[in-house]
């Protein structure tokens, strides 16, 4: 039985990555695609490498009142563009919002799939985590759950590829400006700070007061490395053991005793975490790596949709990362 799937926001990087993954999914059948920047084009015009069976699917202008019969809808729209529109979709259509409009909304479940998979199964409205929270929280969750670190005064220093700025980019993100350059942005006010703070508090049962989060754009296409500093008396081995126990049986989180690299996750839904600790200095360093378009966006969205539909969560996501 095929599950009829639609994608809104296919013109952007997140929507395009969702289409790439869904095109090879064993149960999902893409029957609808919408994108403001590519309406009227055949899918093969926008994505020349799309499988032949999808080549003639025409990208439509997004209109929530004119959807075909769907089982699942992936929405990859800019912040502020989806709240009213998605409220018009019938409840029987399962929705995964890859954008940021529903992460705190009533009636929506936060889809941090490797931490709370049981909360996602059977739901019809899932808010996908942001890309930076996906990297940072995957690394922090085991330590917070086991009380190995304090939830207060955590410092997150994160690096992301230029695709993290979106396909629209903007001033300062062109090749000449981003090549051989390192660009900090969103200091003290990044949109992902409240999401990280609230989830730290939820996992720890405490407060995330004093969180510092500074993201940087680096001259690579995709990938996130979050280097996180926290207070705690645990050893490195205790942190690694906690993560291995926490993620036992989880298909997509790899715990490594070597510092992870962004290349390890490229093109996949994998997350890599590692830890180094100095109890004498009351210091724990946690490292989290994801592909910002994979686990940080479309990959986790497909994982969430699998859980919603009662499918194996690995369906359509078992491909190895791209190397080199």
Swiss-Prot record:
Top-level taxon of origin: Bacteria
Amino-acid biosynthesis in keyword set: yes
Catalytic residues (positions): 131
Disulfide bridges in this chain: none
Example of a GO cellular component annotation carried by this entry: cytoplasm
Main subcellular location: cytoplasm
Listed SMART domains: Semialdhyde_dh (SM00859)
SUPFAM superfamilies, alphabetized: Glyceraldehyde-3-phosphate dehydrogenase-like, C-terminal domain (SSF55347), NAD(P)-binding Rossmann-fold domains (SSF51735)
Cited function: Catalyzes the NADPH-dependent reduction of N-acetyl-5-glutamyl phosphate to yield N-acetyl-L-glutamate 5-semialdehyde.
Subcellular compartments: Cytoplasm
NCBIfam families registered for this protein in UniProt: argC (TIGR01850)
Alphabetical list of CDD domains matching this protein: AGPR_1_actinobacAGPR_like (cd24148)
Top-rank EC class of the record's enzyme: oxidoreductase
Keyword line: Amino-acid biosynthesis, Arginine biosynthesis, Cytoplasm, NADP, Oxidoreductase
UniProt family annotation: Belongs to the NAGSA dehydrogenase family. Type 1 subfamily.
E.C. numbers: 1.2.1.38
GO MF, any single term: NAD binding
One of the protein's GO biological processes: L-arginine biosynthetic process
Name of this chain's protein: N-acetyl-gamma-glutamyl-phosphate reductase
Any Pfam family: Semialdhyde_dh
Pathway participation: Amino-acid biosynthesis; L-arginine biosynthesis; N(2)-acetyl-L-ornithine from L-glutamate: step 3/4
Catalytic activity: N-acetyl-L-glutamate 5-semialdehyde + phosphate + NADP(+) = N-acetyl-L-glutamyl 5-phosphate + NADPH + H(+)
């Amino acid at each position: 039985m095929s599950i009829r799937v639609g994608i809104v926001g296919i013109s952007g990087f997140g929507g395009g990555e969702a289409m790439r993954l869904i095109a090879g999914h064993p149960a999902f059948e893409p029957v609808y695609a919408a994108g403001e920047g590519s309406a009227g084009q055949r899918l093969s015009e926008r994505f020349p490498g799309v499988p032949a069976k999808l080549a003639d699917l025409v990208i439509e202008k997004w209109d929530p009142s004119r959807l075909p019969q769907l089982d699942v809808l992936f929405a990859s729209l800019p912040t502020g563009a989806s709240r009213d529109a998605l409220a018009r979709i019938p409840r029987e259509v399962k929705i995964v919002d890859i954008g940021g409009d529903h992460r705190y909304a009533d009636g929506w479940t936060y889809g941090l799939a490797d931490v709370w998979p049981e909360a996602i199964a059977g739901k019809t409205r899932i808010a996908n985590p942001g890309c930076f929270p996906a990297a940072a929280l995957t690394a922090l969750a085991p330590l917070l759950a086991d009380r190995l670190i304090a939830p207060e005064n955590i410092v997150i220093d994160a690096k992301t590829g230029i695709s993290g700025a979106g396909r629209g980019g903007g001033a300062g993100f062109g090749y000449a400006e981003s090549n051989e350059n390192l660009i900090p942005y969103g200091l003290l006010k990044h949109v992902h700070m409240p999401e990280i703070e609230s989830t730290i508090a939820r996992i720890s049962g405490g407060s995330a007061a004093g969180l510092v989060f500074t993201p940087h754009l680096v001259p690579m296409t995709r990938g996130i490395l979050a280097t996180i500093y926290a207070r705690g008396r645990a050893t490195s081995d205790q942190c690694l053991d906690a993560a291995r126990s926490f993620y036992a049986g989880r298909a997509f989180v790899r715990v490594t005793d070597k510092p992870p690299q962004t290349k390890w996750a490229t093109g996949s839904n994998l997350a890599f975490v590692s830890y180094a600790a100095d109890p004498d200095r009351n210091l724990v360093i946690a490292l989290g790596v994801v592909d910002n378009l994979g686990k940080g966006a479309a990959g986790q969205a497909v994982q969430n949709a699998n859980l919603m539909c009662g499918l194996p969560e690995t369906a359509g996501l078992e491909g190895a990362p791209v190397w080199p």
